[in-house]
Amino acid sequence: GPMPAAVLYTHSKFVQENPNTTQALANAMVHALRWLTKAGPSDIVKTVPESYLLGDRALYLAAWENVRQAISPDGLMPEAGPATALRMLKTFEPSLADKSIDLAKTYTNAFARRADVKYS
């Protein structure tokens, strides 16, 4: 299933006490994701440190083109994403093996939805 990768995470207390900061972080993430989905190869290369290219700009750009489709254009957590992440975590974190976790309580798309509207 879909595997969440670049995410913002914190304690719910921080979100409750700092909604404006939380929204600003979500705005930045969604804005960056939208840019990444539209950026051309030359735009990408201009922003990436030379050391990331590992001496092969063409290979880096080819790899980028292959991974681009996996980038979320709106920053929303896919419905099946948390379950996929939990299954993966349980494979190497023994303390989670027998835990029942209400995944709906572990994330919110509210901030990403507002950011998506802002940058639509």
Model-based region annotation:
Residues L86-S120:
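Conserved C-terminal helix/tail region of periplasmic/extracytoplasmic solute-binding proteins
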Residues Q16-A97:
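Secondary-structure end/capping motifs
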